[in-house]
């Protein structure tokens, strides 16, 4: 503490001091060169982003943009139909992990609580519907999309670590259950489930009150009445779509709700019975196409579930998925887009290549063996990305019979191919100790995923080097792992021996989080 206080008071008197990868001191000449006007990239002697005093303010401006649109009553953004805001939530969570904004945490938890509690969530089997037609997350459009499951799994997994709420971990586990039970096609995942069953929207998912009562014993029925908002009139076409009364896993923060809550065992038993009954009904049709990019996002999310939610089955499933995607979609001729049975649609898209490269780059952080296993494939994918990049402009595709299609920069609803490619390439540059330029911050509503690269390239991700890898439970969420001979960490322009500070308690006051950040 005294050293920190001394530094805070006298830092203007202390000469710049950084470490090379071999832990020797960086020379003053190198530091002077890095500080020269117009210098945008790092030195190999100092494999961390150039740090600007404006970085934090720019990040906070993007958070403030989201705050202005945040629905403080219902969670989410805007005041009409509610779509899950995947990329804004990821940006806010990484910004919060970096200690940039306490308000980011409020927006994240308010939105995640609403989505998992109310009608967007399939409470019986896990997973999520496409969007809700109202602003309070009650009645969904009952379609289920693979990319929603992937990106919500990513978000809930991170949140389970950042905020230590059991409901977030349980929601992540429920998404994986839905993926395995309803989306799984061989070693990959199907694209979607229709909203209709026999031409009726949501018919598989909604209940008359008496249907629920006749399936349960009295104690179970009473527990359901206390857990969910149920009535004879219902909330959708005189039937009930299940909406919880209070967010699961948050009762520890609400003692009064905890006292009035039903026995969880009774609720669980009742829900199992209702799911069994639901399986006897006709089911929505499933779109059997396996889309490469969406499956690669599932892979990224499975790794997040392994790292942050502690789901033991997630990493082996991610490895199995990676092997399938590489063997099925990648060849020397290019990268295919869709598989349907034995048929491939071979047109190459930036979003597919970028998502797969990001997945394999994240997987390479898991072990030296996995790093080596996919090295050649990652190199091939980078070549394919280079073929989709002309004079600083990304192309979404190059059809053989048409002109090239310029890439859109917007996330709608999956991250843009541009943002996926940029983040994947940046992570590879970080892990290879290469020079890289800081990425610009982008509009937090339409291009939020690009801000992950902006944060990482400006030093807001820890770069942790070790010979054999470090348990993810010991690292902050905003960490990148590198395999090397030494043991060191870099953050916000400072490299030092050893690991980053242990993750802070999730409920630490915002002032303490800010104080810790400024000490580094």
Describe every region a protein language model picked out.
Residues 1-301, 307-308, 383, 439-520:
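Replace the tail clause
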Residues 168, 314, 345-347:
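Catalytic nucleophile-loop/oxyanion-hole region of alpha/beta-hydrolase
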């Amino acid at each position: 503490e005294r050293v920190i206080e001394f530094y805070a008071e006298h830092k203007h008197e202390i000469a710049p001091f950084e470490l090379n990868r071999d832990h020797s001191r960086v020379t003053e000449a190198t530091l002077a060169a890095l500080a020269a006007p117009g210098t945008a990239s790092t030195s190999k002697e100092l494999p961390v982003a150039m740090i600007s005093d404006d970085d934090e303010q720019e990040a906070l401006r993007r958070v403030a943009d989201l705050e202005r649109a945040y629905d403080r009553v219902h969670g989410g953004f805007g005041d009409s139909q509610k779509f899950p805001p995947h990329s804004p939530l990821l940006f806010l969570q990484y910004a919060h992990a970096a200690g940039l904004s306490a308000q980011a945490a409020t927006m994240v938890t308010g939105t995640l609580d609403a989505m998992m509690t109310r009608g967007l969530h399939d409470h019986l089997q896990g997973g999520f519907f496409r969007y809700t037609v109202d602003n309070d997350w009650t009645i969904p459009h009952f379609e289920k999309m693979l990319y929603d499951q992937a990106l919500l799994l990513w978000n809930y997994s991170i949140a389970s670590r950042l905020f230590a709420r059991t409901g977030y971990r349980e929601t992540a586990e429920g998404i994986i259950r839905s993926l395995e039970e309803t989306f799984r096609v061989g070693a990959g995942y199907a694209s979607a489930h229709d909203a209709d069953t026999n031409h009726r929207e949501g018919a598989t998912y909604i209940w008359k009150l008496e249907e629920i009562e006749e399936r349960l014993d009295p104690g179970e029925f009473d527990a359901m009445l206390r857990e969910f908002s149920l009535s004879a009139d219902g909330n959708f076409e005189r039937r009930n779509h299940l909406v919880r009364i209070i967010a699961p896993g948050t009762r520890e923060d609400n003692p009064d709700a905890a006292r009035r809550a039903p026995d969880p065992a009774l609720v669980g038993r009742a829900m199992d019975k209702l799911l069994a009954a639901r399986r006897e009904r006709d089911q929505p049709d499933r779109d059997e196409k396996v889309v490469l990019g969406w499956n690669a996002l599932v892979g990224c999310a499975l790794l997040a579930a392994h790292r942050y939610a502690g789901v033991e089955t997630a990493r082996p499933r991610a490895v199995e998925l990676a092997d399938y995607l590489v063997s099925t979609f990648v060849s020397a001729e290019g990268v295919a887009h869709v598989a349907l049975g034995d048929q491939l649609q071979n047109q190459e898209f930036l979003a597919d290549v970028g998502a797969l490269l990001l997945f394999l780059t994240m997987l390479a952080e898991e072990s030296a063996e996995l790093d080596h296993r996919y090295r050649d494939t990652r190199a091939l994918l980078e070549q394919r990305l280079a073929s989709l990049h002309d004079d600083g402009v990304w192309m979404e595709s190059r059809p053989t019979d048409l002109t090239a299609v310029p890439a859109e920069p917007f996330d709608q609803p999956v991250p843009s191919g541009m943002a996926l490619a940029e983040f994947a390439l940046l992570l590879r540059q970080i892990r290879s100790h290469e020079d890289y330029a800081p990425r610009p911050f982008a509009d937090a509503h339409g291009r939020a995923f690009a801000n992950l690269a902006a944060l990482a390239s400006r030093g807001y991700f820890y770069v942790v080097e070790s010979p054999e890898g470090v348990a993810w439970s010991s690292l902050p969420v905003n960490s990148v792992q590198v395999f090397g001979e030494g043991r060191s960490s870099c953050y916000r322009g400072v490299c030092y021996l050893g690991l980053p500070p242990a993750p802070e308690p999730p409920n630490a006051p915002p002032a303490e989080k800010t104080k810790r950040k400024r000490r580094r």
